[in-house]
Amino acid sequence: MSADEVYSRVRKIVSDQLGVEDDKVTLEANFQNDLGADSLDTVELVMAFEEEFDLEIPDEDAEGIATVQDAVNYILSKKAA
């Protein structure tokens, strides 16, 4: 799975879950500061990532996923393992 493919899928999930335009979901975008997510939204995003990519993200790891790039990097690291 390529980084571009992961980014595309993460971008769609974030856009759908948070109701923001695709073009606002950049790699640098912070879920809370830039995209308006609250803590519940963040939990729901992590759950959506788990389902989409068939992986489990422990709470301590989820706390470190603040940006779109963080999510992409985390997913890539788990899928490469």
UniProtKB/Swiss-Prot annotation:
GO cellular component: cytosol; membrane
Localization, UniProt: Cytoplasm
Domain of life: Bacteria
Chain ranges of the Carrier domain: 4-79
Name of the protein: Acyl carrier protein
Listed HAMAP family: Acyl_carrier
Posttranslational modification: 4'-phosphopantetheine is transferred from CoA to a specific serine of apo-ACP by AcpS. This modification is essential for activity because fatty acids are bound in thioester linkage to the sulfhydryl of the prosthetic group.
PROSITE patterns in UniProt: CARRIER, PHOSPHOPANTETHEINE
Annotated metabolic or biological route of this protein: Lipid metabolism; fatty acid biosynthesis
Family statement drawn from the similarity comment of this UniProt entry: Belongs to the acyl carrier protein (ACP) family.
Principal location listed in the UniProt entry: cytoplasm
Organism: Synechococcus sp. (strain JA-3-3Ab) (Cyanobacteria bacterium Yellowstone A-Prime)
Annotated SUPFAM superfamilies: ACP-like (SSF47336)
O-(pantetheine 4'-phosphoryl)serine modified-residue sites: S39
Pfam families linked to this entry: PP-binding
Physiological role: Carrier of the growing fatty acid chain in fatty acid biosynthesis.
Gene Ontology biological-process entries: lipid A biosynthetic process
